[in-house]
Amino acid sequence: LGNAKNMGFEIDVIKYIRHFGVKANYTYTHSEITTSKREYKEGSAEYKTGVTQTRPLVNQAPHTANISLLYKDTEHGWNAQLASSFTGTKLALVSPFKDADQWDKAMFGLDLSAEKQFKNGISIFFKANNLLDAKRKIRSEIVKSDYNIIARLNKRECVQATEM
């Protein structure tokens, strides 16, 4: 393994005007670790050991940003959010060989959620993820949009309908 460094900063701002709000967040992260790798010798089935390479930590994007439009009306039991997010390029899989790591590309996302709480304790929750249908490659699977409607009865039972 090796000695890792991980540092950064985060800014989080939220502002409401009556029932409407905006929430913004930005995170910068710098991470690095130097590890040993193997390197193929040109024209041979053998490989050289003792080679090192510096890389970021796995799943550590240097830039992550979110901005959300919020609606909150506690008197009438409404809560809603339209959230956009950006995640920068990040290391997905570390290879034992030099210059053979796999990376995830930067991605934008847009999600919508809403909840209505009734005075009798029942609430209905709706969530739609990945409204822009951004394609993410995760271990050879393509993840697309999905939608959930959840009804909570007395906060003990949960009925869920999902479309994928």
Q: Which residues does each PLM region occupy?
A:
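A broad helix-preferring feature
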Residues: W78, D111-S113
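Flexible, active-site-adjacent loop/turn segments at secondary-structure boundaries
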Residues: R55-P56, K105, N129-N130
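Short, functionally important structural connectors and interaction interfaces within domains
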Residues: D12, T49, D99, S123-I124
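Gram-negative outer-membrane beta-barrel transporters
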Residues: L1-L93
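Transmembrane beta-barrel outer-membrane domains
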Residues: G2-N6, V58-P62, D101-M107, E157-E163
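Juxtamembrane/interface motifs at transmembrane-helix termini
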Residues: G43-S44, D101-Q102, K144-D146
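Extracellular loop and loop/strand-boundary signature of outer-membrane beta-barrel proteins
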Residues: G8, G50-P56, P96-D101, D111, ...
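C-terminal beta-signal and adjacent terminal beta-strands/loops
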Residues: S85-V94, E115-M164
